[in-house]
Amino acid sequence: MVGPTRSKLREGSSDRPQSSCTGQARRRWSAATMEPQQERSAPQERTKWSLLQHFLLGGRKLPSGARNYAARRIQSLNAQNYFQLEEVAKLLLLNRFQFLFTLLDHFREKVQALQMHRFSHRTLFGLAIFVGILHWLHLITLFENDHHFSHLSSLEREMTFRTEMGLYYSYFKTIIEAPSFLEGLWMIMNDRLTEYPLVINTVKRFHLYPEVVIAYWYRTIIGIMNLFGIETKTCWNVTRMEPLNEVQSCEGLGDPACFYIGVIFILNGLMMGLFFIYSTYLSGSQLGGLITVACYFFNHGEATRVMWTPPLRESFSYPFLVLQMYILTIILRTSTVHKKHYMALCFSNVAFMLPWQFAQFILFTQIASLFPMYVVGYIEPSKFQKIIYVNMSSVALCFILMFGNSMYLSSYYSSCLLVTWAIMQKKSKIQKLGGTELQFWLIQGCFWWCGTIILKFLTSKICGVSDHIRLSDLIAARILRYTDFDTLIYTCAPEFDFMEQATPLRYIKTLLLPLILVITYLIFKKIVRDIMCVLYTNTYVRKQLLDNAELIFHTLQLLAFTGLAILIMRLKLFLTPHMCIMASLICSQRLFGWLFCRIHFENVVFGILTMMSIQGCANLHNQWSIMGEFTNLPQEELIHWIKHSTRPDAVFAGAMPTMASIKLSTLRPIVNHPHYEDADLRARTKIVYSVYSRKSAVEVRNNLLKLHVNYYVLEEAWCVVRTKPGCSMLEIWDVEDPSNAANPPLCSILLKDSRPYFTTVFQNSMYRVLKIN
């Protein structure tokens, strides 16, 4: 149901610049003070027991297998026997009462421990809920301040979802507007609007399980509330600044965009609560959890972009990676692992991989961190084998749930799992090849890397996905400095550029980087000592190695995330939160117990937090000071013109971000879109983007007609925009098509006069719609 419509003046706003040791010591002291008491009381106990045995057995020892019992009768008692009997009676009575008192005292201690344990868990989860709500409020505040989302019309809200965000949201919109949920699901699994005239399964291609689940929740919740007559949204007439007309704006669960964004922010709020629990477990202290939460907030702009771009795949996927790494930490630390932990690991793997195509490469770096730990001996072979089997099961489940998507079988992740399993099966044979322990390690490492690369290449050829762009291909292009049209389209985008030089400086100002360097240094000292112990003394310190497994894993994973973030700036979303988690180890007794036995570690922690907060609070203030209001009048005019002046089956082509908005808001068929990983789509996009090349107009027109395009949306900015040297469309095309480098740009010609091969049918300050003749 919809509440009453009221008038509300949109407020003016400025534009956004861019639209514990003490307890252990006490236990040791208690044990040390009790031992002498036990030694002093031992002779007395032996005297009493000898007296009791002498009286009952007449000085004889008990026969083998006999039980102690008192004589049934005493025929005669002399004075000595009387006093002996009295002493025995006191002893028996005292022992019984001592046993009873000891039992009651032990029971009382158990109850107190249980109550303290329950209170500790209540406190832990209570704090986790608190920081989760805090993060949720932080996200919605930043999002509202930036977009003024509560005052936008439905069309304006859709336009805020630019590039691939609009593409994902369009499928959510399709399901909720369909007559039934199953009909909507069938529509997106047999979609003809996205890559016209092809019919594609968008759930398989675009990893749309989040949209399917949220759409199901939306239809269910709204259906129940409508059944009981509960109001689901309230609408206003919002007066916009001149020359914009008045629009209707709605808030509440009944508004699809508000519901969709709300679910994403709730999920990421829960993630912050999970961060607190995770880091508390890793560090062994709730203060460690506090350190992680504070570091995350103080470095929020470097840790996530969910507050600016909610519908991106990482917003749904990354919280489940945090859950997966928490469960894996429990498995690595615990000596006896229950089946439920492996089941939870499998679930979190699947939940992490299903929404995001890049997730498999992140899990590959995880196996690459675990394998050397297995080789050196930080992980028991049986435990590591179970972890590999769980990961294999996760790949199989994702392959099934994604309708046989061959990308899951041809990735580095699946290849390294098979190679790891093979090395474990043939370990005895491989051991014969190496003489020393170090040689054995190196041979296994070479087999692992070479086998993974070769198997990945073979499976890609067999599955026919060798031409698809993945995260690994972009990293390889970065390292090898290989450039072509496809890689430049990616790497010229700011989020796929190298890490900014200012990023490490920001980490230093909040003390995050210095803290991580100290912690990493201490862990590496442990690693070197352990390896030297194995290699040079030939003594395998199994207990110590197993105790340090989770610390080694997090350090190796930190190195992997650092490398990824340096090569691709977008992957800071893995590095910065992981640094925040590892910062909690400043409260670890195993790393800093030598320090905390000399000074109170609470003072150290709060001192660090105080110094962090100097720059951290300034960062938060900068985020909160971002005030803006979304508006894009040229695109709004374009969408209105398309809705009212073109047929519903008119096919459009143009820049990928604009095509996503046209598909979302007008439901017109498009031939290209921002999901650029597929090889066929990249070929289509290259044809579409040839308008910005130096090719002839007739050649471009003929290629567009082969794609059944009726209208081309030309953007003047794309003709001249240059984000950095070598990244304008003309420069990219000169690399791809050097034979036409001497010709004039086609875009400039079409802007002057589009005839005879095109006709300009719509024009404003940003867009021109060219009808293809």
From Swiss-Prot:
Q: Which residues lie on this side of the membrane: Perinuclear space?
A: 144-209, 278-311, 380-386, 459-507, 570-590
The intrachain disulfides are none
Its top-level enzyme class, in one word, is transferase
**Ranges of the Nuclear topological domain:** 1-122, 231-256, 333-358, 408-437, 529-548, 612-773
Molecular function as annotated in GO:
glycosyltransferase activity
Q: What tissues express this gene product?
A: Predominantly expressed in testis. Present in testis but absent from epididymal sperm (at protein level).
The signal peptide here is none
TM spans (from-to)? 123-143, 210-230, 257-277, 312-332, 359-379, 387-407, 438-458, 508-528, 549-569, 591-611
Protein name in the entry: Probable C-mannosyltransferase DPY19L2
* Biological source species: Mus musculus (Mouse)
